[in-house]
Amino acid sequence: MHRRSSGSPVEDDAEDPLISRTPSEPSGPNAVEPSERARPQVARTGTSFDLRRDHTGASTPRSRNSSTWRMPSSATTTLLPPDPRSSSAAMPLTSQRLLAEASPDAQSRSRPARLRSPWPCSILTALTSLLASLFLCAILRSFAARQTGGDGCGIPVMSPAFLHMAGFDTEHTRFASKYNLYLYREQGVDPFNHENLGLNGAPVLFLPGNAGSYRQVRSLAAEASRHYFEVVRHDQERLRSGTRSLDFFMIDFNEDMAAFHGQTLLDQAEYVNEAVAYILSLYHDPKRSRRDPELPDPSSVIIIGHSMGGIVARTTLTMSNYQANSVNTIITMSAPHAKPPVSFESDVVHTYKQINDYWREAYSQTWANNNPLWHVTLISIAGGSRDTVVPSDYASISSLVPETHGFTVFTSTIPDVWIGMDHLSITWCDQFRKAIIKSLFEIVDVRRASQTKPRAERMRVFKKWYLTGLEPIAERTLSQKEPNTLLTLEDQSNTILPQGQRLILRELGHRRSPNVHLLPVPPQGVAGKKFTLLTNQRFDKSGEQGTLEVLFCSVFPLQNGKFSTVFTMNMDFSGGNVGSTRLACKNAAEDAIHLPASTHFSKHPYDRAEPFSYLQYDLEDLAEHQFVAVVDKAQSPTKGWLLAEFSDSSDAVIRARLGLGGLLSAGLKMRLPANRPMLTEVKIPALYSSLLDYNLKIVRRNHGNQQELFTPLLRQSIPDPHESKFFVNVKDVNVNLHGVAPFMPPPLREQAAVGGVSFQLWTDPSCDSTVDISLHVDIASSLGELVMRYRTVFAAFPILVVALVLRKQFQVYDQTGYFITFTEGLDSALRSSLPMLLLAMSLLASSLATSSRLPPSDDPFHWPLNSTESPIDFTKNDLLLGSQDAFFWFLVPLFGLICVGVCVILNYIALALLSVLAFFYGIFKSKSGYIKRDDKRLVPGFHSTSVTVTNEASNLPIFSAPTPRKRMINTAILLLLVSTTIPYQFAYLVACIVHLATCVRAQWHAKETKSTTHYNFFNYTHSIFILMLWILPINILVLLVWAHNLVVHWFMPFSSHHNVLSIMPFILLVEAMTTGTMIPRVTTRFKYITSLILFSIAIYAAVYGVSYAYLLHHLANIFAAWLVGVYFFSSGFSVRRLWRVLEGDEGTSNSEPGSMKKKP
């Protein structure tokens, strides 16, 4: 029987294959004993050998075609007397396999086959993978199950009609065949026809996001048309003030993917500027417009951008074809302003940097004339934790725009919306679209060429509609108004409450006639006093006939000399008595703050219930007034109630003096006394990170019999960005926030980074009950926060692991001649380099977070004012995991652990795929006449005495390959296409597919021949394949953009991604491996270059891989270039050798002078 050995060395088989061999004892398949003079002699003999043994156990040469191994002429073979003691130690691996078959004790000395198999893994690797899988499952489960709020969005009603602006053709833009411009008209509401478009108002342009549709605007546009038709056009005062309809235009980007390709982003911005110019020109044509000819022609357009459409909107203002002041208002929804959503493409990262630098530079100018964006307002609206497409942290513009020109707000903050939204529902949610459209109507002023009010007024409108009114920057109108109501009271009236007493009305209309309750305003000079009023009724404006009106009054005539002789309202409660008190009052309805209703039946803040009305003033805001008048105008008893009081900050504000460590260890517990104010504010500065979730419990302990007017209402808020969340009928709350987030650039204002979370709790103080509050870190829920903040970690950290594994594999290979399996390399890395590198990265992360701080400044926006002041480093959080808190140092080893498990999973998935494909490949080979286990072309030769093979001979091809001419032509064509037409990412995909086929063939041949050299080659190709798989996602996104362009018949080549040097090393490396040629060992000092390159890739993947992932391809490309160099220069570079490498037959040469080698 023809016995098979494992083909392993015999001297070292009893030892671990990773143990170093001594230099004096060559081993492995590349052991060399040169004999130059023997090479031509063997080449000329043409002897073939049969490896069958005779009765003595010795192998004898026989001429048999079915089982002969042809001796390549390059094999350096020395015919020596047999010496069993030294032959196995000195000969290379392939020769040792020949001798092993001739030896009776071959099986005992051979390397066990199970150690060569790529499937087994060590206990350490298995336990690490199991632990990583458990962490990964816990994170994904937490992300899927964490509390994100219910749906809650109303369904909009619309009748859309989209009019294609066919006139916007190639005469106006070079993108006319790719993009399109449309005008929205609401059927049955907007008058229009093909001759006259019915343009009558202010132009608004909608920009869809990444792969988004222009039809997403229909809900906003329909609401604008219906609101104007049903409300605005009937309000003559608003019409006289310049309010008109909104003409919604929209751009069809053909579902282009600007998030993945920087040049596409710039192309869209160029098209938008050309579209804006065309839209403005439409209003000059009286045949297309129904505008009043006395009104000025529009010179500016309002832009609404969804997702990447918001970034395109900001980019338009930086383009060379931008017309100055043609855009002055930008509203974005779920737009990633601060950071690109993915960093896989260099142009996207560079374009983002250029755009953000332009905006920062513009707003850093001292004089408005030097700021091209002085008249621009930017409002960024984020959906919150329900948005699983773009991290809502990235919507922050605090690092770009001062609060005088814009702000960031969450949909859960907007009054009467109070709900988080996902990435798509933010475009159609009924409550949200109503707030957006009402705010737009309030900023429109068609009497101005800009079509909008001045910037300061626009900012006041946006703050009024988008902020709760409880923020420090919220503006109050009370001090800006003149008294318009004269309130006359009887002198002997008992309606004035004693100083400091709380006003409680449990029922309105109890007296069945109008009634007045006066609260005296405390004297000025008492610090921290605050007035609060809460009711379930709506406040009446002057002249309205409702149930409740709140006035702030001063004794008439006014003490400061401002005499007001004309009052629009006169409220007389004196009964005609001569001795009466007259008060000049201001109505406070415009300062009313809506809060979600909180009753025993409330479940969500967005429930369809009439909201509470709330007033809040600091005592300083009431300096001109002596009384607060609450006028109960109900004519019959109602269920309305009211609470009003003046409170001290010492009782109403609680600041928690504990750090993050205290929250983790013991949590926070406190009890509010029964005599507390209606509003209690708890500030926790240590609670600022967006990576941690908390569980808040509120327990009421009733001691009285008085029924509650309302159940506890909680507001969770942070100052920047403006994120507020309301919880009604609160008992148990999951607290998550978008505060200090990873990778975010620092804000322009230093104080924006501090402050922490504030909890405002409204409770009924009239029930004589205490309230217990407890706060604890929710570890399980916090795991889910890692998904959105660190998704791109799984594009970087696995490359760290793979690089260290490859480093270990090449170290062992260069030292011993064995190319160990991926799992063996991973096990070795887990015992040495990987823990040390992760430890070093953890220390670096902690050091960077500790040393991170903002430069001090007295400037309100904290911009550098002179050369001695250090500017803000907006990229300082790009390193490692981007954490600004040293507390999260453990995330580095955690993600390293998870990525080890992910790499193991991908390794086995790849092995399974290769095994399946190899099975079908074997079926094909058997049908084509291939004889199993007889393809011994790899073995260079044999003689009955002893055989020694050079390093060159051991690297022979193990399977046939196309002719070198064909491979050169294919490579040249591919590189030519890369330099002209296709992006190099397409060539990379081709290289991955070709290398997959190489791995399939390598695995099949290794299984069939049971040769260690075959297994070496398979392990080598498989590890390179794993590396290429992890690099593939970095390239696939640009490839999707390119393929999408082909689908929409846009055949203009990319202006970037045609550098052949970015792909040539990969192509040459893959071509070299298609010949079945094993990479030569590097035994000189140059072997350290391999380790250095791979270690550099690992360090870069850890430090910069998340923020600049696109460079990982280029680093891997450098590694591929080095491997190609090893192929070419291992035995000296020459044209002849280059030809032999391409041919895949390094062993065929003729070293004799003047000899000729025939081409195949």
UniProtKB/Swiss-Prot annotation:
Transmembrane parts of this sequence: 120-140, 786-806, 832-852, 886-906, 973-993, 1023-1043, 1060-1080, 1092-1112, 1115-1135
Q: Could you provide one GO biological process annotation from this protein's UniProt record?
A: GPI anchor metabolic process
InterPro entries under this entry?
Answer: AB_hydrolase_fold, PGAP1-ab_dom-like, PGAP1/BST1, PGAP1_TMD
How does the UniProt record describe the way this protein sits in the membrane?
Answer: Multi-pass membrane protein
Q: Which GO terms describe its cellular component?
A: endoplasmic reticulum membrane
Positions of glycan attachment: N65, N866, N1019
Q: SUPFAM superfamilies, from UniProt?
A: alpha/beta-Hydrolases
What's a Gene Ontology MF term here?
Answer: phosphatidylinositol deacylase activity
Q: Where is the active site?
A: S307
Compositionally biased, Polar residues: which spans?
A: 57-92
Q: In its UniProt entry, what is this protein called? A: GPI inositol-deacylase
Species for this entry: Aspergillus terreus (strain NIH 2624 / FGSC A1156)
Gene that encodes it: bst1
